[in-house]
From Swiss-Prot:
UniProt subcellular location: Cell inner membrane
GO biological process assignments: proton motive force-driven plasma membrane ATP synthesis
Origin species: Shewanella halifaxensis (strain HAW-EB4)
InterPro entries xrefs: ATP_synth_F1_ATPase_gsu, ATP_synth_F1_gsu, ATP_synth_F1_gsu_CS
Protein name (record): ATP synthase gamma chain
GO cellular component: plasma membrane; proton-transporting ATP synthase complex
Length: 286
């Protein structure tokens, strides 16, 4: 058994760690609330944009944009959104597992795969995973702007325009609630059709002044908005996961302190008992 002094040092060390994890929990809770506000503000735009684009994909268009054409999936691209930092439980691990499972299916079907990473963790993982990383962005902070992502996203869009990609997906953690974040893979290109079920009529649009100019701008904006929404959702998920992880760490530290305190008391009691025994033995010898 360790002596009382060593145990006391361990208790002090665990208490210091507990203070740090408790502070990180409170910071994460504050950041999560702000991230939720940003997510709630941008989610309606992204969802309605997806609905409109879904109807466009169903419609009979006078100008057939390349993003609407379904090609054989020989090369597939993934825009993977992760965190820059750790200490957020299994958030990144679960996301990477989902991507790897989907990549395995694509490769079994004979497709080649490349990645665009947003977040330092995904860049580290996919560089070691062995996939081709065509573009990356990191250090976006807790409140990224669309302009911070445009350059990275455009690399994948240009690859799609040049026929180097036949499918493009975005992967991120969707915020469900504080306790639940779900990794999702959403198709960006070719444009997914609306999921609202059967239509009672055909969706046709009149484009003014020029359908090509309008669709070229609108469809690029759609892809950018979906990636941005994925980043915002992932940040909210990150802070929620970090808050839960730090709370668990704080609680575990408390339990460890209690256990160490019990061991300390036993060690101290044993030391006192030994001293008394030595005193009694010395007195008896005299």
């Amino acid at each position: 058994m360790a002596n009382a002094k060593e145990i006391k040092t361990k208790i002090a060390s665990v208490k210091n760690t507990q203070k740090i994890t408790s502070a990180m929990e409170m910071v994460a809770a504050s950041k999560m609330r702000r991230a939720q506000d940003r997510m709630a503000a941008s989610r309606p735009y992204a969802e309605n944009m997806r609905k409109v684009i879904g109807h466009v994909a169903q419609g009979s268009l006078e100008y057939k944009h390349p993003y609407l054409e379904v090609r054989e999936a020989k090369r597939v691209g993934y825009i993977v959104v992760s965190t820059d930092r750790g200490l957020c439980g299994g958030l990144n691990v679960n996301l990477f597992k989902k991507v790897i499972a989907d990549v395995k299916k694509q490769r079994e079907a004979g497709a080649e795969v490349e990645f665009c990473t947003i977040g330092a963790r995904s860049a580290q993982f996919f560089n070691s995973f062995g996939g081709q990383v065509s573009a990356s962005a990191s250090g976006l902070g807790d409140a990224p702007k669309l302009v911070d992502l445009i350059g990275t996203v455009r690399v994948m869009l240009e690859a799609y325009n040049e026929g180097k990609l036949d499918r493009l997906y975005v992967v991120f953690n969707k915020f469900v609630n504080t306790m639940a974040q779900t990794p999702v893979i959403e198709q960006l290109l070719p444009l997914p059709k609306s999921e609202e079920g059967e239509f009672t009529h055909q969706w046709d649009y009149i484009y003014e002044p020029d359908p090509k100019l309008l669709l070229d701008t609108l469809l690029v904006r759609f892809v950018e908005s979906q990636v941005y929404q994925g980043v915002v959702e992932n940040i909210a998920s990150e802070q929620a996961a970090r808050m839960v992880a730090m709370k668990a760490a704080t609680d575990n530290a408390g339990e460890l302190i209690d256990d160490l305190q019990l061991v300390y008391n036993k060690a101290r009691q044993a030391a006192i008992t030994q001293e008394l025994s030595e005193i009694v033995a010395g007195a008896a010898a005299v």
